[in-house]
């Protein structure tokens, strides 16, 4: 895949958008350290970015199916490129201006996700999409390590304002680098309202029982397992182990495991791809399970490495099956439904977990999270067509 020029351009574009996305919170964190932004202001800016993302995802799914996927990527990237310097302009002056600009950046981020997913299906032949998706998700995992590291290194020689403008340049690359896909569908005079068009994508998703089951399992794991990582892991690292090194080590182990999983899925095609993917998703249950008892930190690291490995064993076949099975003209809308539910539930889970821990205690909540992570994929595996993530199995 890395020898094909069109895919290289697509891969570089997605990588640039990933770097810009992951770098922004760390750059704003540096602004808090140098007192040009308060902690409360940081929370507001990041919250508005998330809101912009969630609003844009379903809208962009409709637009990417209605018009050109490449055009949606272009305008999404340009939105991020233009809004990022505005965040820099508001730094130390106006949190309101920063928040409005961050909402536009978040909208650009949300708009490009389903469009990139659909554009991949246009650029890459069907029999090569699994290694292509593996290469893209590998880039995502590398950026989670590279973005904070690069930010810290660049901060030695560049100020926060310059770094924020730099994320705009990354968004510009994301806008300009990807290749053209298929020609946009011919416009029709009887276009349905956007909400009705999005509903058509929902109906397409309902035609695929494996998709609904897998999405429900993914949502359950994100709501419980991801929330345990976001809330419980930092506190347990501090209170039980007396050091933030356990938090850093667990997150690093997760990323390393995910990298291994992406490399593995570039070549491995199990016969029962759906079941293998759901087993991988269930591995996330070991993350909250490792936090239940005062085990050695190495056990926590191993559990998070397994979770990272498993999430890519799920992600790569999941994206590939969606691109293969969903009707092409509805792919962006179905992908936007996927991203809306999976990303949208993450902050909801975080909001619920802390009160649940206060009410019931650490151990019952973590045990419940682990149980859900194990049982939800197992239940999804029982649904007809889940074995290979294909409706053909039902015939």
What are these regions (language model features)?
Residues 1-395:
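Alpha-helical transmembrane-bundle signature of multi-pass membrane transport and export proteins
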């Amino acid at each position: 895949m890395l020898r094909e020029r069109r895919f290289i351009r697509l891969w570089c574009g997605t990588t640039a958008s990933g770097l810009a996305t992951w770098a922004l919170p760390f750059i704003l964190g540096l602004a808090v350290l140098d007192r040009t932004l308060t902690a409360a202001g940081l929370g507001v800016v990041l919250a508005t970015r998330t809101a912009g993302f969630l609003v844009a995802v379903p809208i962009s799914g409709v637009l990417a199916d209605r018009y050109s996927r490449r055009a949606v990527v272009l305008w999404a990237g340009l939105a991020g490129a233009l809004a990022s310097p505005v965040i820099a302009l508001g730094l130390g002056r106006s949190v309101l201006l920063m928040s409005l600009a961050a909402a536009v950046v978040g909208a650009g981020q949300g708009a490009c996700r389903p469009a990139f997913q659909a554009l991949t299906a246009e650029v890459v032949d069907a029999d090569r999409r699994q290694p292509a998706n593996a290469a893209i998700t590998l880039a995502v995992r590398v950026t989670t390590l590279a973005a904070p590291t690069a930010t810290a290194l660049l901060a030695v020689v560049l100020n926060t304002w310059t770094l924020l403008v730099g994320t705009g340049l990354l968004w510009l690359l994301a806008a300009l680098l990807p290749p053209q896909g298929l020609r946009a569908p011919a416009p029709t005079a009887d276009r349905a309202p956007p909400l009705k068009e999005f509903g058509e994508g929902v109906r397409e998703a309902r035609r695929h029982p494996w998709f609904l089951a897998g999405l429900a399992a993914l949502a359950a794991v994100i709501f419980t397992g991801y929330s345990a990582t976001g809330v419980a892991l930092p506190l347990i690292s501090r209170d039980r182990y007396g050091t933030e090194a356990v938090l850093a080590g667990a997150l690093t182990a997760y990323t390393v495991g995910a990298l291994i999983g992406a490399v593995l899925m570039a070549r491995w095609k199990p016969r029962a791809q759906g079941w293998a993917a759901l087993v991988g998703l269930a591995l996330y249950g070991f993350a909250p399970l490792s936090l239940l008892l005062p085990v050695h930190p190495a056990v926590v690291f191993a559990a998070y490495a397994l979770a990272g490995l498993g999430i890519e064993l799920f992600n790569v076949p999941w994206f590939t099956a969606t691109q293969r099975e969903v009707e092409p003209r509805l792919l962006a809308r179905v992908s936007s439904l996927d991203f809306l539910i999976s990303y949208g539930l993450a902050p909801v889970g975080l909001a619920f977990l802390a009160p649940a821990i206060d009410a019931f205690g650490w151990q019952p909540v973590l045990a419940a999270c682990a149980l859900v992570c194990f049982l939800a994929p197992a239940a999804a595996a029982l649904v007809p067509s889940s074995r290979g993530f294909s409706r053909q199995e039902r015939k």
